[in-house]
Structure formats: structure tokens, C-alpha cells
């Protein structure tokens, strides 16, 4: 009988690096949507609520503070919500406030920052709060880019403000037709061997 063993230096306790990809031993990917306002959100939630997939939302704290009930609704639907900072930026002054807001809704620790432009200052802010910094494998990929660059453990980010809701089914078919499953960010980053 073999026991599962994590690496000596586990990524979940090391905040110095960007996480560009999840576990490559599992054919799973994570899809992230950035939420900055409600323009596209209600239609999108109606659309994906009919599907059996796990979507991850990084929510702007400015929008969140005015839409706490909507965030509770998203959490109750089974979606994970995370801190996008203020206007997509993390700074020393406001990260505590936005983390407290997220944690009061999810009843979980805020543990991820989203950093699409590899901003080292923001990574350091997140590191001091013991938050892992996600640098997605793909940002707003077209269907062709998704087909060409899909790999085990991919973390795919879309901006919900500019996202075409009619494309979600094509995106999911592209992913699942290649044998991948869409999972929660926590599950994709998990270092356990599958």
C-alpha cells in the first residue's frame, strides 16, 4: 500500500511564485471570470446555472461592497468567489478590507490574487497576506487559442464585461471534447496525485 506524499516544498505554502498552471497529473482545468460590474452577470449566471460546471469568480471589491446580496446568491449557487482587489489592483491599504468582505460572504479565507500582467508589487502585497498569486495560463483566449493551448491544469481567465455569453457552450465543448473537466480553482491547484 502506497501513501500519498506531497512535495517537500508545497506550492500552497509558498507565496513567492506565480501559479501559472494547476496539477498536471489530472485532466482538469479552471475557468475564472472577472466581475467588475453587473452588466453581463445576470445573463451569464442564468446561462451557466443550467450547466453542471464549477466556475470561479474574482470580484472587484468596489462592485462587491454595493452588491453583497448578489455575491451571497453566487456563493449559494455553488460558485467560488475571490478577491479581485479594487479596480483589479491589490494594494496594502485596501487588501484587508476586500479580504474581510469576501471572507464574510464565503466563510473561507481569501487565498488567491489574480495577476494577469505579472505585477511584482501586487504579488508582494498578496504574499504578505499569505495569498497565492494566480497568473492564468490563458487570458481571454479565442476558441482557436483555447484549442491550441489547452493543457492539463490550465487556468483560463475571461473578463465578464466583454465576454460573449453565447460562447460559453462552445468553450465548454472545446474543453470537454479533449477529455478535460472544468473544476474549481482549489481542485485544479491541488498537488495531490490523481
Task: Show which residues each predicted segment covers.
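Metal-dependent polysaccharide deacetylase catalytic core of the NodB/CE4 family, i.e.
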Residues: 27, 38-39, 45, 49-156
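N-terminal pre-catalytic segment of deacetylase/amide-hydrolase enzymes
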Residues: 1-32, 37-46, 180-194
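Short amphipathic alpha-helical surface micro-motifs
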Residues: 12-15, 96-97, 164
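Short loop or secondary-structure boundary microenvironments that flank
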Residues: 35, 61, 161-162
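Catalytic grooves of carbohydrate-active enzymes
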Residues: 39-41, 146-188
Amino acid at each position: 500500500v502506497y501513501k500519498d506524499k506531497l512535495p517537500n516544498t508545497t506550492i500552497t505554502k509558498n507565496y513567492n511564485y506565480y501559479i501559472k498552471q494547476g496539477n498536471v497529473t489530472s485532466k482538469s482545468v479552471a475557468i475564472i471570470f472577472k466581475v467588475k460590474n453587473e452588466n453581463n452577470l445576470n445573463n451569464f449566471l442564468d446561462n451557466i446555472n443550467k450547466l453542471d460546471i464549477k466556475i470561479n469568480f474574482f470580484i472587484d471589491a468596489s462592485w462587491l461592497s454595493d452588491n453583497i446580496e448578489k455575491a451571497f446568491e453566487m456563493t449559494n449557487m455553488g460558485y467560488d468567489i475571490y478577491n479581485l482587489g479594487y479596480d483589479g489592483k491589490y494594494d496594502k491599504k485596501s487588501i484587508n478590507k476586500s479580504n474581510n468582505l469576501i471572507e464574510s460572504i464565503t466563510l473561507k479565507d481569501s487565498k488567491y490574487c489574480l495577476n494577469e500582467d505579472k505585477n511584482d508589487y501586487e504579488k508582494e502585497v498578496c504574499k504578505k497576506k499569505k495569498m497565492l498569486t494566480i497568473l492564468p495560463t490563458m487570458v481571454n483566449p479565442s476558441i482557436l487559442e483555447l484549442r491550441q493551448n489547452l493543457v492539463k491544469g490550465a487556468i483560463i481567465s475571461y473578463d465578464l464585461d466583454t465576454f460573449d455569453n453565447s460562447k460559453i457552450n462552445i468553450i465548454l465543448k472545446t474543453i470537454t471534447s479533449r477529455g478535460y473537466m472544468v473544476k474549481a480553482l482549489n481542485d485544479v491547484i491541488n498537488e495531490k496525485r490523481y
